[in-house]
Curated annotation (Swiss-Prot):
NCBIfam families hit by this protein: 2A0604s01, secD
Protein name: Protein translocase subunit SecD
Domain of life: Bacteria
PANTHER family in the record: PROTEIN TRANSLOCASE SUBUNIT SECD (PTHR30081:SF1), PROTEIN-EXPORT MEMBRANE PROTEIN SEC (PTHR30081)
Organism, as annotated: Helicobacter pylori (strain ATCC 700392 / 26695) (Campylobacter pylori)
Length: 525
């Protein structure tokens, strides 16, 4: 009999893999590591609601802005262009331009699907219901991507950003320790960073302070807060351009050595910016960020180059965060913090300590029982359990999985599952030995008889783990992940690994005079 057999080689390979990839996580050395969840590490957990209705409004606003700009270029006379949640509406003043208008709408439609209604020169344009639903879904995905991008630029390690429900997003930020870090992270995540250039309604702005939002709406305008001057300012409702055309944003210092955010527009945005400023010298244009006016300077001359600045008495950190938000892209819909929980690092450490005590304590008790009851067979089973634990840690580290408190519970459960497998195998071997059969036959029949039951129970548990991971959330996923990995590891260690060890030891086992030493049982008299 060869000392090294295929099963033993697989077991040794699993041991080396497990130890090799577990070391970085256990000893904090370089290499792939397990990410500790909030409940173990401490940090900030937020549940965000995405207001997808606003994404639809912004879509119609952008469409109205593009329609107004291109209609003027093509000398198509339009009147009363209005935009709301239902779509955009306007009047075509010259019916002879209908074909040109239809061609323009077809061009603006792009890959979207419009519903266009015409009646006596009055038009209404809106997205189809299917297109609206698709827009809402894409908005959630876009917001998730932007949040991840911002957090990466902010320098936060291992943030978790996932969709939860239809229009909600769960954000977990391990390692947030101070109130200042919490505030900055919350502001960075919740800021829409929706940049717009809007014309001041010079005709009616003098009455802005006593005007209501409804009165402004009837004028085709909108009332916004003026950060620079205080009070309200009246702007034309249809923006000149928006942040979709922004290509870069960075912190610079003005002539007073105050931090401001400089932004750059793409070629299309620069052209629109230049055309508008050239045609409106002497009038004011407002720089609007998240529905707040940061400045509304008078246009002195045509502004070329497609760049501008946002100032607002920012600190360096605030200006830096704003630049990050602008660079990562504007959210097409604002978000609202629905729930916020802070888990302190001390609580996380206590959780880790308690979990490790439970795991190690349970492991020692199990090992003690196995050795006392099954003798050397119990020692072999304990070796398989150790390899099982190393494999769980290694696989989670390789894939960058997050270990949570429920995940630790899953590992403890896995120890029990792996022990069950070894108990079944040892009992089947002992049953055959009690029938005065040889050791080689007892081991062979023991594994054959036990494997079927082990596979059946483990496959059932594995299916349950997969379903829990697929349809569960947060804590449930953590539990399902470690349980699933542990089940697969237990199959390798219990069925393949221990059998390989017995095959290697078989020459010695067949010559033994003490079955009790090896299996804790004597042959039947």
């Amino acid at each position: 009999m060869k000392l090294f057999n295929a099963r033993l080689i697989v077991f040794i390979g699993a041991l080396l893999l497990g130890v090799g990839f577990s070391v970085p996580s256990l000893l904090e050395t370089k290499g792939p590591k397990i990410t500790l969840g909030l409940d173990l590490r401490g940090g900030l957990n937020m549940l965000l609601g995405v207001q997808t209705d606003e994404a639809l409004k912004n879509k119609y606003l952008s469409l109205a802005s593009a329609l107004e700009y291109n209609a003027k270029k093509q000398n198509i006379l339009l009147k009363d262009i209005k935009s709301n949640l239902e779509g955009i509406s306007f009047e075509l003043l010259d019916e002879d331009e209908a074909k040109k208008l239809d061609a323009l709408l077809l061009e603006l439609q792009g890959h979207s699907q419009f519903e266009i209604k015409k009646e006596a020169g009055f038009y209404s344009v809106n997205l189809t219901p299917l297109e609206q639903e698709e827009l809402r879904k894409n908005t959630i995905l876009q917001v998730i991507g932007i949040i991840r991008n911002r957090l990466d630029q902010f320098g936060l390690a291992e943030p978790v950003v996932i969709q939860q429900g239809k229009e909600e997003i769960s954000v977990q930020l391990p390692g947030i320790k101070t109130l200042e870090e919490e505030r900055r992270a919350k502001d960075l995540i919740s800021r829409s960073a929706h940049l717009q250039m809007m014309a001041v309604d010079e005709e009616h702005n003098k009455d802005a302070m006593k005007m209501t939002d409804l009165e402004a709406q009837k004028l085709g305008s909108v009332l916004l807060s003026d950060v620079e001057m205080g009070g309200k300012i009246l702007l034309k409702a249809i923006p000149i351009l928006d942040g979709e055309m922004l290509t870069d944003a960075k912190v610079v210092y003005d002539q007073n050595n105050q931090p401001v955010v400089s932004f750059t527009l793409d070629a299309q945005g620069a052209k629109i910016f230049g055309d508008f400023s050239g045609a409106n010298v002497g009038k004011r244009m407002a720089i609007v960020l998240d529905n707040k006016v940061y400045s509304a300077p008078v246009i002195r001359e045509r502004i070329g180059g497609g760049s501008g600045q946002i100032s607002g008495n920012f600190s360096v950190a605030q200006a830096s965060d704003l630049a990050i938000a602008l660079r990562s892209g504007a959210m097409s819909a604002p978000i609202q913090v629905l729930e916020k929980r802070i888990i302190g690092p001390s609580l996380g450490k206590d959780s880790v300590k308690t979990s490790i005590i439970a795991l190690v304590g349970g492991f020692i008790l199990v090992m003690g029982f196995m050795v006392l009851y099954y003798s050397m067979a119990g020692v072999i089973a304990c070796l398989a359990l150790v390899v099982n634990l190393f494999l769980i840690v290694a696989v989670m580290a390789i894939f960058g999985a997050t270990l949570t408190l429920p995940g630790m519970a899953g590992i403890v459960l896995t120890v029990g599952i792996a022990v069950d497998a070894n108990i079944i195998i040892n009992e089947r071997i002992r049953e055959v030995l009690r029938e005065n059969e040889g050791i080689a036959k007892a081991i062979h029949l023991g594994y054959i008889n036990a494997s079927r039951a082990i596979f059946d129970s483990n496959i059932t548990s594995l299916i349950a783990s997969v379903l829990l991971y697929a349809y569960g959330t947060g804590a449930i996923k953590g539990f399902a992940l470690t349980t699933g990995i542990g089940i697969l590891a237990s199959i390798i260690t219990a069925i393949v690994g221990t059998q390989g060890i017995y095959q290697a030891l078989l020459p010695k086992l067949t010559q033994t005079k003490s079955l009790y030493f090896w299996f804790g049982v004597n042959k039947r008299a």
